[in-house]
Amino acid sequence: MLSTRVEKLSSGRLLRIARMGSGPPVVLLHGYPDNLQIWSELAIRLADQFEVIAFDWPGMGYSEAWPGGTTPFHMAERLHKILDELAIERASLVGMDMGGQPALVFAASHPERIHRLVVMNSLVLWDEKTSWEIQVLRKYGWNRFILRKFPRLVFSRAERTFLPLGRKLPSELRADLWKSFSQSDVRFFIARLCAGYQGTLMQLPEAYKKITCPTLALWGEQDQHFPPNHARRLCATVPGSILKIIPEAKHWMAWYLADTVAQTIRTFLA
C-alpha cells in the first residue's frame, strides 16, 4: 500500500495524495471503482527512476469534491490546477479507465505542461464496442440507480472482470477501495462523471488530433470492457502514437502485472 497524506489546497479543499521517488515527474490517474491505491504496485516500480505522484480525483477516493462539471474537459482543468498546487511545471501522465480521457484532453489543451502520455484501458471512443456492463452504465438513469442501490454488486463485478479468474485483491487494498467507493457521495459523483463523459465522448476525437506529445496506448489484450480496438483507433487518431498490447492482460493489469507494465512505461519514458 502507498503511504498517503491529505493536503489542504489553496481553495481549502482536501486532496489525498501519494508522492515518492525522485527524477522526472510521472502522474498516475485512476478510474473507478478504484482510487490511488490501485497504483500501489506500479508506483513503487517507477519510483526508482521518477518522482511518482498519485492522487484521488476530487470527488473520488478520499478527496473532497470540487464544484463544477464532470466532463473530461472539466477533469483535465482540475488536473491542471492540481499540478499548479503541487508546483509541477511539466510531467508525464499515465491515465487508466476514467483517468485516460482527462489525460488525453490535458495533453491536447496544455502541450507545454506534458512530456509524454500513456493511456491504458479506457473508454476513448463513443462508437466502439464495450462490455454489456459498460453499456448499461453509460445510460444515466440506470447508472444512477445501480450505483445508488447496488454498490456491492458494482464493486464485486469489477473485481471479477478486472482481474484473471481466481485472482483477488489483497485484503488491505480491497478494504481501502471499498471503503471509499461505498460512500454515497462518491458514488453520486461517479454517476455524474459517467454522464459527463458520455455526453462529450463524440467530441473527444477532435481533441485527440491536437495531441503533439509522444503517446503510448498500452492495452490489455483481454480487457473485456474496453477491447483493444479502442487502442487501435486511438492510435489512428493521435498523431505519431504507439500501440502496445499486453498478451492476456485484463483491466487492472497495472496492479497484477505491475512488472510488465512498469518496464513498458520505463522504456517509453526513457
Task: Please report, for each region that a protein language model flagged, where it lies by residue.
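Alpha/beta-hydrolase fold catalytic core
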Residues: 1-26, 47-50, 84, 88-90, ...
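Conserved HGGG/HGGXW glycine-rich cap/lid loop of the alpha/beta-hydrolase fold
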Residues: 18-62
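Catalytic histidine-centered segment of alpha/beta-hydrolase-like enzymes
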Residues: 249-258, 262
